[in-house]
């Protein structure tokens, strides 16, 4: 018979293998037969493996029968419930560990911080931070890193920054977390400043640093900065790393530079699911929907399984192309994957069928959703509105309120779009007022555009002009563009020129869409010099070479 030490070595080697649920059950049986079931190390490993395979029942049974629970075992079960988003149980377990003889360690607080950020419980997150400080772990690297990340994810960037600055000697992982936090919260410039400070303090960036640095570059206006980040990746030979490659593809996609995104993608030796998803999303964002569908087809052929978010994006491309054939193919694929009940996928399917003219299919899908939420309602209301079924769309809005759901900005965009398609000016004005007074939602550009279109369609151009001029300055050029379009339709050249002058003051005259409209207005006035100037500039809008920039 093998000694206890030999058995432990055998079991240790077994635990290093990939653990399926069946393998974990075999390991559990072997550990029990070897009389090592009460060994804290193996109990912790088994609980962790059960949790990884989403078998909470077995993990909890193991935890409950174990007499002497180490902090590692507590952490395993807390992590398991946090992974399953059962945060009430997580809190209950934390209360139990505080009452027990076991003292929570830095990993315990790190796990709890992640749980609170996942549930967007900022009050609980602050409370855990306070308890960690009292226990002497507030400035621990692991605990601090998790809390900084949790604060950032919850949008509490000030708290995250204060905690980061209070930690005496942050390691590279903590620097990366803070740079990522700044990027995700929209402070890309602060992330870059921190990146420079990090290097000044003697830390060399790794692949995770560069991924964090790309996180805040999400706008076409930041393309120069994006190129500089890419150049730095090339300089330190990190561009070939799979994580960095995927991040660069995603960065360029969000900056609407699909050519650079494709170039990086093609340089990746074996593009994984993340890289493919990033490029497909980029194609969709840039309006290259056929390319998005083509790459998605290649992804399917390769055997990679997309997630619900990617499927929803691809269905959006089908909707934009009004391609019901591809849409139905994706729907069949969704059923084979078992994703047909996912609320994001269902909502995307409803939107796709509506925009492809198959409203009956959309309504049938909506009826089959077991737990409808505001996203699915929004998709159906928009579909009904686009097809002119205004009364049914407003019935669905009433149903939203009766179910106790809270309408959001998109709900009111869909309702105002419905009013536009059916010419319901009075109803649109009523909805616009209710949005502000009853639901406390501040109108966005899209809502104002619909209101201008409604008034313009009714021929009330002067009223629309007064409405637009009453808005806070500077007025968004999208709203002015909608008014200019209405002036063109009704051939009101006098008002069109006034609106055109406002667009010119906004500095948006350079955009091709406004150049075309403005040139049409000036043509009616016979101002041919202005027409020639504007139309000559259209072909040059994107022809110039941008100057270089470097902040490294």
From Swiss-Prot:
GO terms for biological process: mitochondrial RNA modification. PPR repeats lie at residues 39-69, 70-104, 105-139, 140-170, 171-205, 206-240, 241-271, 272-306, 307-341, 342-372, 373-407, 408-438, 444-474. It comes from the Eukaryota. Pfam families: E_motif, PPR, PPR_2. Residues 479-552 are annotated as: Type E motif. GO terms for cellular component: mitochondrion. Belongs to the PPR family. PCMP-E subfamily. One of its GO terms (molecular function) is RNA binding. The keyword Acyltransferase does not apply. This is Putative pentatricopeptide repeat-containing protein At1g64310. Keywords: Repeat.
